[in-house]
Amino acid sequence: MYLKTLNLRQFRNYQDQKVEFTAAKTILVGNNAQGKSNLLEAVELLATLRSHRMTRDRDLVQEGEAIAQINATLERQTGVSDLTLTLRRNGRRSVALNGESIRRQMDFLGVLNAVQFSSLDLDLVRGGPEGRRNWLDTLLIQLEPVYAHILQQYNHVLRQRNAFLKRHVETLDATSLHSELAVWDAQLATTGTRVIRRRDRAIQRLAPIASAWHASISGSTEALQIKYLPNIPSEDNHPEEVQQAFLVKIQQRAIAELHQGTTLVGPHRDEIELTINQTPARQYGSQGQQRTLVLALKLAELQLIEEVVKEPPLLLLDDVLAELDLSRQNQLLDAIQDRFQTLITTTHLGSFDSQWLKSSQILFVKAGEIIPNL
């Protein structure tokens, strides 16, 4: 797949900017806070309808404006598509494909695929479980767009159940409380089981690919293991088994949930365990080794998406070369070559050899404006 054009209107610090991509690799050069990352974020939003910055739509709309719009033309083996995402300061976002409004956002997902790799991704190793869950969910949305709907359903039930626990614990008698809670329990178990099974399947597919990349980058001196640790332990990934285990655990934690007024059971408490040589990665070795792990994860994402969608996704590298030493930079640049269309942000061109610079489109970014290399 090849991103041909991108048009940003009133998005972040861009007033009205059109970019035409003329090479497999585009390097965006500029000082910090000029808008380089904002451009990559716009592409990520078209691919996943999520931002790794976890911002609200109103923060994406330029100050003083009511709406922001991201528009792109994308060439795939099946033909050229025109994608539009409209963000509103007050109100719901909307999407359109080839000029036609799309009601279900999951029908928009999967048209453009992209893998984002930024310095924030180092938190995958160092940070808490929520960051790893978000990372896995973003990958899953691209592998299986219906997952966005599945996750939305689960989160909706979770919010409702939490509200019920907070609101009614003190006001209802025991019989009414348990009968009403049983309805929410059943819905939580049904929707949660769908999330668990897909996360489990995704990790089973990703783990061996990431381990192979990790062995290659580390010269086979370190063994990476990725394990999915669902909050609901079950022997089998069969839906009935998982659902039953879910309901059993809810019963076990019922008193604690009533006491704390929140849901303590479900995939919103899952963990993805990363270990190097059987030691938790966050405790293991240097920042360099942690960066190797994240690089292996990102290369595995690229490979897995390509295997599933049968076309190479875009790669978005946000100021990440500065975070990698020379050997890891070369590993990454060698893996990319011209296989993936790549957008790279950097503050200077010193990280690239002359061959790379010759084969790349170089754009300069200053205060929300993009100037080609003249």
Swiss-Prot record:
UniProt keywords, alphabetically: ATP-binding, Cytoplasm, DNA damage, DNA repair, DNA replication, DNA-binding, Nucleotide-binding, SOS response
Annotated source species: Nostoc punctiforme (strain ATCC 29133 / PCC 73102)
Location of this chain's protein in the cell: Cytoplasm
HAMAP family referenced in this protein's UniProt entry, alphabetically: RecF
Metal-binding as UniProt keyword: no
MF terms in GO: ATP binding; single-stranded DNA binding
Main location as per UniProt: cytoplasm
Gene giving rise to this polypeptide: recF
Highest taxon, organism lineage: Bacteria
Family: Belongs to the RecF family.
UniProt name for this protein: DNA replication and repair protein RecF
Its biological purpose: The RecF protein is involved in DNA metabolism; it is required for DNA replication and normal SOS inducibility. RecF binds preferentially to single-stranded, linear DNA. It also seems to bind ATP.
Gene Ontology cellular-component terms listed: cytoplasm
